Amino acid sequence: MDTVKSINKGYGKVDETQDLALKRKTRKRLYQIGISVAVLVAIIISSTVTIAIHSRKGNSPHPTPSSVPELTPAASLKTVCSVTNYPVSCFSSISKLPLSNTTDPEVIFRLSLQVVIDELNSIVELPKKLAEETDDEGLKSALSVCEHLLDLAIDRVNETVSAMEVVDGKKILNAATIDDLLTWLSAAVTYHGTCLDALDEISHTNSAIPLKLKSGMVNSTEFTSNSLAIVAKILSTISDFGIPIHGRRLLNSSPHATPISVPKLTPAASLRNVCSVTRYPASCVSSISKLPSSNTTDPEALFRLSLQVVINELNSIAGLPKKLAEETDDERLKSSLSVCGDVFNDAIDIVNDTISTMEEVGDGKKILKSSTIDEIQTWLSAAVTDHDTCLDALDELSQNKTEYANSPISLKLKSAMVNSRKFTSNSLAIIAKFPIHERHGVQSPRLRKSPHPTPSSVLRTVCNVTNYPASCISSISKLPLSKTTTDPKVLFRLSLQVTFDELNSIVGLPKKLAEETNDEGLKSALSVCADVFDLAVDSVNDTISSLDEVISGGKKNLNSSTIGDLITWLSSAVTDIGTCGDTLDEDNYNSPIPQKLKSAMVNSTEFTSNSLAIVAQVLKKPSKSRIPVQGRRLLNSNSFPNWVRPGVRRLLQAKNLTPHVTVAADGSGDVRTVNEAVWRVPKKGKTMFVIYVKAGTYVENVLMKKDKWNVFIYGDGRDKTIISGSTNMVDGVRTFNTSTFATEGKGFMMKDMGIINTAGPEKHQAVAFRSDSDRSVYYRCSFDGYQDTLYTHSNRQYYRNCDVTGTVDFIFGAGTVVFQGCSIRPRQPLPNQFNTITAEGTQEANQNTGISIHQCTISPNGNVTATTYLGRPWKLFSKTVIMQSVIGSFVNPAGWIAWNSTYDPPPRTIFYREYKNSGPGSDLSKRVKWAGYKPISSDDEAARFTVKYFLRGDDNWIPKAVMGMPPL
């Protein structure tokens, strides 16, 4: 029997290459999301910051001798470098430059950028050279990734240099540009890390080449990190030096500012000057110089010519994907080529839109309007992204199957795309960096911040917080209202419309595809996809309805309670879509159908993620305090969530109830089976429908569908009223559908019931209970099985005084879940297996999901000799907290284990915490040393994961009057 590490859980746990791809993609966005939020906050509070800065200027326009430390240049450099992770390399690299004889922190920062640029330029060709030394195609592919990423890193650092404003020939930082600099340098740091990730993927090779490149990258990694650290601390550093930001005159700070003199240049020199701001200056000069009208010194005319170059090149390759598709019968490759054809056409439309926005003037020439610069940058950025999307589609094939890595068709298309991507990048760099407005006496918008944000700039800022900004911008911008609004709430509503429309367009696809196959396993997987798409549509629809109530009511802001709901429902939709992909990955089907469905899901996946990011990062207001002061009281509280209304709470506590339906196997009730009772439940009921199930064992599989709302089912005791099933993965049923009992409708409650899956450990995945019910409660129930016993799939769930038994990942899912006063009991698994209690499945940083185990007991169910862990991270943002619980000695001292030892330790994006646990297994001295694991340090921090806080995810929802329950 395989060890637990090799058991297929599906659900994102099978394909290691996909897992690595997800990690690379997510890491690439982590800094951008965080910094984009900072940009939004800066927009909101910009007026306050401006007042504060100028007040400081008014109070002290020039630093007094007493306010400026008497530092030598060396001491100044040492002070600035002290904020970095690599102060020694920071000091030694900058001190070698001639201009380092300065005490000005801003000049030191500029010198640090020069160090980075020089170092990156010295290694940018290294991956290509090293690739010539090997025949290992996997290694060549990794080196190609590094070459591309180092290219991008140079772009980002160049943008950082260009963004620093010009004053009397000098460059100077201001507060408004610092967020941009942080974003670009963060991206450059990420690109280094992604290159290293790519090299680590091919660690099986015996070649010394990866080590050569890693060694070659040490300096650039450190220098880029140094620049990022310096700019992140620049304001406080300048303050420490006693230099007011506006003490030195900035552009437009004085009506007497000396204009920058622009030397008269020849056409050739002008072209070189314009192209110098691009990443590919040689291709920029050579391509534009071939055009007849390139004999000009006008930067704006040269920009127009760069666009013409892009259009010509794109038109020359637009039909190539279709032609290449005729040369292959491989459906997956055809699908990727279709993606490339679509994005090429989109890029052509974008560049044509760019040209169209240039205003006609009297002599037939075109001139850029400053008001359109933001739009042009957005469009050209999207055109660059279109190229990358094609490359991603081709690279995804090679990640899954090595035969695609050197496919002649893929290589043909990649080679043909080289120029169009370079030319598009050149046009973007020119409009973003070169002051092309000075000829017309119009100040460059790069140097002038409009006090009134435009619809396009707000859309771009909002979309920058998402994982897929290009698809966010392109999808929302197609809606008419996006052209006129600067309200983030309205843009969020438009994003929901985009998501809803896209989900509706694919919701029937699994059923259609099922008609194209006779493979019963694949049909079963497609059936799961149909079900979860349905659930996702409902979740998005709930989100829209709730938001529309706020908008129609004329409220300007969403309250924290509503935002908590919206994040929960969209988190659920993200999970639902991911579950379809996971289910398709549970088996290796000899069919193009899974890839067809995955390709069709791309937009819905991205759009749902975008909507979640917007509400979580833009609309959710930061808390005024870390946590209400009553942190300790919350930890000691054993009350139910506040959405368990007093009347419902009385139902849970009552001893004598009058049910709507009574189930009795002996015929003494209204019906004999639980399913018969479920059929009697009204659809979308507003009041609680009560089902009583008398003592007995009911062998049946029960599904409480999504339209069965507010159902309360109770029995005579967890050991007396039992629902039993044996559906399992080995017998051909997908994990999602193996549950003995599943509930999807909101407001579900269960009391004094036992749910069992008797399939046994040999049958692997065999779920006893699955919950997708939002605001559901389980009181004095038991869930008994082996692998995957309790599937807390999605939405808010509360388990109180319940028993859960199992072996492998026996509490798993991506709901927002609290276990309180429960008995969690691992049992003996198969030989060579180990136990893992939890496998939490949060996919994205913005999901408010996770598992909190509070005031529980973790003890063995019988004689357990197998190694037992508290859990392992299933997904990239896995979140699990165990606090104030009793942990038995049978738990391994390490506490936690990585999903696959190949990736040990897990990424720092996971969130694993413990707090004030007791028992022999609670000793933290030998716990894992992961970046994503650490003990909680205070009651206030721990209170975030209590019932009152975690199940709503916001500081402000805790009621004044706590609803008490009997002591645990």
Curated annotation (Swiss-Prot):
Region Pectinesterase inhibitor 26 C, residue ranges: 453-614
Catalyzed reaction equations: [(1->4)-alpha-D-galacturonosyl methyl ester](n) + n H2O = [(1->4)-alpha-D-galacturonosyl](n) + n methanol + n H(+)
A Gene Ontology cellular-component term: membrane
Cross-referenced Pfam families: Pectinesterase (PF01095), PMEI (PF04043)
Region (Pectinesterase inhibitor 26 A): 71-230
Keywords: Aspartyl esterase, Disulfide bond, Glycoprotein, Hydrolase, Membrane, Transmembrane, Transmembrane helix
Primary location recorded for the protein, binned into one broad class: membrane
Glycosylation sites: 101, 158, 219, 295, 352, 400, 464, 541, 559, 603, 737, 863, 900
Region of interest (Pectinesterase 26), residue spans: 660-954
Enzyme kind, highest EC tier: hydrolase
Tissues of expression: Expressed in flowers.
Top-level taxon in the UniProt lineage: Eukaryota
Binding site for substrate: 735, 765, 872, 874
Pathway where this protein functions: Glycan metabolism; pectin degradation; 2-dehydro-3-deoxy-D-gluconate from pectin: step 1/5
Active site: 788 (proton donor), 809 (nucleophile)
Site features described as Transition state stabilizer, chain residue numbers: 787
Entry's localization field: Membrane
Gene Ontology molecular function: any one: enzyme inhibitor activity
GO biological process, any: cell wall modification
EC code(s) of this entry: 3.1.1.11
UniProt membrane topology term: Single-pass membrane protein
Transmembrane segments: 33-53
Additional facts recorded: The PMEI regions may act as autoinhibitory domains and prevent untimely PME activity during transport.
Function: Acts in the modification of cell walls via demethylesterification of cell wall pectin.
Name under which the protein is recorded: Putative pectinesterase/pectinesterase inhibitor 26
Gene: PME26
